[in-house]
Amino acid sequence: MKKMMLVMAMALMGAMQVSAQNVKVDDKELIGTWVMESMQWEGEKKTVCGKESGYSQFKFYGADGEYACAELALTKEGKVVVIPHEYGTYTFKDGWYSEMGREAIKDAIVWVDKTTTKGTWMKRHDIWKKVNLPDKVVKYIVDCCKTKNTPADIQQMIKQSMFK
């Protein structure tokens, strides 16, 4: 009898652990502003983003598929530097994620809960938190990312005049 109870308890614990690992969150919860909480390259120490490290990343996911990504650095003088990474579009459906028209990847974003995701980029493991930032801040960072994309006509003129 004790063996049977032990087996049942272990089976129940295993089932509970599996269900805790498979959090189901609606795809639309990705919409909004996300800030990197931590990152860890394989074989290296975990970096906690924020004031102490002076580094973080920002991602914006719009309801219409708009996507913006930037790095944020805090200088020794206390100034924030926004380093635009990219601006374009994203898709996210049933665990399949793509940004900037790249091939979709299954489980590139894994839900921990409604406001936390984890994922791996190359060999870096990231944790992201959904945050409410002032609209003015979000607009500024997204606009910085937009200006990183040089218009096609300007690109062509630069190529013709500087890269002959």
Task: Walk through the language-model features, giving the residues of each.
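Lipid interaction determinants
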Residues: 21-85, 96-164
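Positively charged n-region of N-terminal signal peptides that target proteins for export
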Residues: 1-4, 20-21
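Sec-dependent N-terminal signal peptides
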Residues: 4-14
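Extracellular/luminal ectodomains and secreted, surface-exposed scaffolds of diverse proteins
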Residues: 88-90
